[in-house]
Amino acid sequence: MAISGETIDYGPCAFMDFYNPKTVFSSIDKLGRYSFSNQPPITKWNLARLAECLIPLIHQNEDPAIKIATETIDNFQSIYEKKWLNMMRDKLGLFGKDKNDLKLINDLLHWMELNKADYTNTFCHLMNINFNNESKYKVMSFLNWFKQWQNRVLTNNGSVEKSINLMKKNNPTVIPRNHKVEEAIEAANNNDLSLTNKLLSILNKPYDNQNNIENYQSPSKNDEYQTFCGT
């Protein structure tokens, strides 16, 4: 992690289809150090390493410099939790704040994990983009949560229409599905860039409700997608 806020190491990485907080994409990450759920603490760890490099610039004496850096890094968790909660409220089209918001969000994530629901497509379903009409969204466990969500949407002068408009600004309808990226790479290696150009054209408008892109919205049929690290 650089002081500019940019990330430098981009691989191995991939996009998560079915929601699983333990998802990893590196063949050597056996303990889940870089799993989806471990991104916040590993980000804090990276920031701590960055702070170590800045110690000589923070204070002329090392001890007070370390104290300042430590206190600053310790603020990360509370800042992250607040930002994450606000982000998830936007993804669910929730205006204002409610004491039960965190539970509502975590209940949905837990349901996704238990039912192997696609992360991106679940939010699309809530936005009434029913491109696949999966039966899992008709089960009672989801419908019970859905009713709670609808009741929350109508609070704080909200409406379904206003909520969906907010959701459309915060939820992509299409992401670079790993299997589609692999297809494009394989074709490009055989001097065929048509799949690459098509994929880039679709991904250039991730928040639009585009026509005839269902094939790019479907998760891979494989249970696992693994990338490899050369280190």
Question: Whereabouts are the PLM-identified features?
Answer:
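Flexible glycine/proline-rich, aromatic-decorated loop/lid segments
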Residues: 9-28
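Regulatory N- and C-terminal appendages and interdomain linkers associated
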Residues: 30-231
